[in-house]
Amino acid sequence: MQLNEVCLRANRKLSVLRSVKILNRQTLDLLYKITLRSVIDYALPVYFNNLTQKQKMRLEQIQYRAAKLVTGALHLTSKDKLNTELGWETIKKRSEILGLNIFHKIHRYETRPLIRSCMPKIDYERENNLRSKGAYIPFKNYGSKFNSSFFPYHTKLWNTLPKNIKALNITDFKTFTNTMKPTRYKHFQKGNKYANSLLTRIRVGRSQLNQQTFSLGQIDSPECLCHHKEESPMHYFLDCFLYLQERQAMLQLFEHYIPNFNLLYI
């Protein structure tokens, strides 16, 4: 089966990624996209929507394990928070984006004629209606499996797009579909792997800070060693007297790069 082969190949690539996990985050992110995600992407829009929920989760789980390797995140980290942290779309969203790009390419007659013959007919009456966003007549209902196959599913999805988007060339259309992806914060990749991993764990809410560890039921109290009621990120960075020297060194470094930063801090 296609899915089993994809998962087998992806897990092999994941093993390679695991062997070089000490590399910096930017490099690991790039390696994931070049080696592992390219395996998942192959024919993904064609078969993804006909998978069962359990089968879809197998693909999502592979990406989740890769995200933990890239960021150095701990076990039980939220999958959604990791995707937001990295600026990665879910496998489902990626399937839709890739499918729309392929469908638009076929619509623009930039593929072989044979595949164009699989397209539905253009709804000229609705196309001339200024209020209508539709361009193709939807396929007849032949059951959920047929409706989830490539052409019926992406015809329906493509018909929901605004007319000005449908008129774009393929390059501009891909620029549009890229806006459907989560925002990517490049400064999250800065620093060496260890320091970057520590900051990432705090951002995604799964660090060794007592507040975050307590929320998972791994310790009995969120109290800080200084006896503050919660060892939260805010308390850790700005208030706890146990880290006064480290905080002063951090603020001096900020002041060096950002003049008058101390005024903002106060």
Predicted region positions:
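Structural motif
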Residues: 22-34, 89-95, 141-145, 187-195, ...
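Amphipathic alpha-helical
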Residues: 113-153, 184-188, 203, 216-219
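Short, charged alpha-helical motifs in flexible N/C-terminal segments and linkers
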Residues: 55-127, 235
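Amphipathic alpha-helical/coiled-coil segments positioned at domain termini
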Residues: 80, 85-89, 94-97, 101, ...
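Extended, well-ordered alpha-helical segments in internal regulatory regions
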Residues: 35-50, 96-101, 105-106, 157
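Basic, alpha-helical interaction scaffolds
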Residues: 1-46
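Family-specific functional microsites
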Residues: 178-266
